Amino acid sequence: MPIKLQKLPAAVRWGLAVLCAAVCGVLWAYYWRVFFGLDNRVSPLVVTLGCAAFLEVCLLAGYCVRRFAKGFAAKGAVCIFLCGLLFAFANPPLQTPDEADHYLRTYAISTGHFDFDASRTYPDDVAYLLEAFPGAWVNAHTSAGVGTDPDTGAEKAYNTAGYALKQYGKEGAVQSMADSFALYLAHDVRDSVPDPVSEPVSFLVIPFLPGAVGMALARLLGFGALGCLYGGRIVNLLAYTLLCALALAKAERYRPAFAAIMLLPMSLFMGASLSYDATLLGCYYLMLALLTRKEWNTQTAGIYTAACIFVNIAKPYLNLLWVLPIFLVAKREWYAKGCRPLWALGGFGGAMAVTLLTEWYGTAFRYNYPMIERQGGSTVNGGEQLAFVLRNPLRTIAAFWGTLGENDFFIGQLGLFGWKDLPISFLNLTGPLVLLLAALLAAAQPKRADAFPTRRRVGGAALLALVYAAGAMAAMYITYTPVGMVRIVGLQARYFLCVWLALLPALAVLLRKTIRPAITEEKAEAAITPLCACYAVFGAVLLFQHYFVGPVYVVYA
């Protein structure tokens, strides 16, 4: 007769969990050792103990969350922060898009420099860090050519694009991100002096303040350039976590969808970096969460307007679209002081004011910079591209559609990390499935009998998502893409995270009407956080694996 785990004493159940975690750690270490030849690089005992200890720590963290965190929002926030910590350390230095420039600007702010001076240089420690960890590390270390296959003697082309580890010959040493750490940590004994590093072409201050606080604290504790990087990442992650916690607390419906998006590996990858996308994504998620509230009071309207103004500091003009959802709140649902048009006008005026003020500040306090060329070179011209788009609307639509098709509509690139140079196939394949699971759980039977949000809210948010996606594509096409090019340059999956979140409630409504899931809202919310937290932990492990363990591309030169 089978034994039901629920009837076993809690101590026995947790004892079995500890045993299972240890066994899984041993098996995972064995897989790494066999498939990636890890025994030639690291002691088998170290690998085995490390994997087992890691899973035991994860189990302990899960127990603490279950035991001490009360409520959906609290549990979600703790999981976001803990899983984000894994990404902060699994992701090598400066490997988030544009993180090298973000690091330099954040470092300057952390030392009290709130202006922008191209003649100002950084300490040698910072220069050594940027030398050891170039942005787009995988692309920077990619090799291509023609070699000879030792088994057949035939010539064979090779290309290490997408591989962080490579090996020249079967007996050669494996080159990996670990070499960059060794290079940086050995800079004290090197005779060479690094090339001086000056301030980047980046003229924002406010979005980098959380990371700057983390760097300042790390410096007070005696850490160098590398420690400052991790300190900045952790405080940036804390800011992302607080915004997500507020969003989960304010959301009244579809909370499984919010938790799933917030715990996506791509969201945590950006949230636990020095990118201002950490707070940008948090504000997007917060604004969408507020749209699920049945009634809006002055506090709700104030939080929404503040978030709307903030996102326009980091990403101006396009984010003015976020003023419009205020009108999705019906008149009978509006309890804030002042009418909706007045709040919308205030949000629009505030957003335009901070945009113009940011542009003025970046120009007025900019010193010793030469003429700043357009990204993409002389072939990029916004005015000419806009005129080309207006003259050729059908061709532009074809270019947009072709770009989406080439990039799996960006929903199939939720596992594309680094500077778009490190694909993790498992996460690319399973990312859409996780979103589908989130929609299914968000379609659970609501606690209240009255259906809310209304079609007006859900449909309006979905329409906003589509317009925002089209606007993001148009902005990149006009400002970053050479005139007349048939594909858009620079689009990334992270730009569409808020789009997927805005579309999930609409998908949940369709699923509720078609398959009528029997699961209750309470059970759905109880299930989504541990499931997505486990997926996030696995994503962090895969990110670490692809940078430090394998797969290894063997080059036969």
Q: Which residues fall in each region the model found?
A:
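Short acidic/glycine- and proline-prone juxtamembrane loop motifs at membrane-interface regions
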Residues: 273-280
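Membrane-lumen/periplasm interface segments of multi-pass, membrane-embedded glycan/lipid transferases
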Residues: 359-446, 554
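Membrane-interface alpha helices of multi-pass inner-membrane proteins
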Residues: 269-271, 300-316, 320-327, 350
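Interfacial juxtamembrane loops and adjacent helix segments
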Residues: 113-229
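Transmembrane-helix signature of polytopic, membrane-embedded enzymes
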Residues: 13-17, 71, 223-226, 245-265
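Start-transfer (signal-anchor) and selected internal transmembrane alpha helices
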Residues: 1-25, 29-30, 34-85, 342-348, ...
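Transmembrane helical bundles and short interhelical boundary loops of multi-pass, membrane-embedded
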Residues: 23-50, 353-372, 518-557
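Perimembrane helix-loop-helix junctions
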Residues: 290-299, 321-352
